[in-house]
Amino acid sequence: MGISRDHWHKRRATGGKRKPIRKKRKFELGRPAANTKLGPQRIHTVRTRGGNKKYRALRLDTGNFSWGSECTTRKTRIIDVVYNASNNELVRTKTLVKNAIVTIDATPFRQWYEGHYVLPLGRKRGAKLTEAEEEVLNKKRSKKAEAKYKARQRFAKVEPALEEQFATGRVLACISSRPGQCGREDGYILEGKELEFYMRRIKSKKAK
């Protein structure tokens, strides 16, 4: 039959049936959902009205995520889908849709933070550093550079809930792009009240 976005196949408000006034038209068509899954990248192009293109992501495993309070964006790996307000089935099947809550790899953000502020983030006391990390955090710097980093460090506060996540190496994020339409998986790191809310929801779901 084909998926149609018309309204004349529905009954009237009174409950009476409508007579079809015409056959289905091309401009009323609908397409099946992409149901983007977590996996090695696979994107199909779809020709749309006007000769335009949509990018139908069938599988994705990376995306650009922004850290709002620090005004920085990094490309990182998506690890898992943990919550979806609309449907638990989408969590079970690891389907990536807009507004899904996912866990992402925290490493690119930690590397940026430690390079920008010269402060450790989410590290246990006395944890061994690699040579590269040692060089970033304990490098000998000029007085001018030291003053620059000291000035930055005044604003280097990270909320405790987020710091705990950095210690585990995974951060909760929300997807804000539409992977079935634009073929990308972009979003933002959860912070503040929003992070508290979703952590409560995930906890209550696990308790069931």
Curated annotation (Swiss-Prot):
Residues 1-33 are annotated as: Disordered. Residues 7-26 have a biased composition (Basic residues). PANTHER family: 40S RIBOSOMAL PROTEIN S8 (PTHR10394). One of its GO terms (molecular function) is structural constituent of ribosome. NCBIfam families: eS8. CDD domains: Ribosomal_S8e_like (cd11380). This is Small ribosomal subunit protein eS8. Disulfide bonds: none annotated. GO terms for biological process: translation. It comes from Apis mellifera (Honeybee). Belongs to the eukaryotic ribosomal protein eS8 family. Keywords: Ribonucleoprotein, Ribosomal protein. One of its GO terms (cellular component) is ribosome.
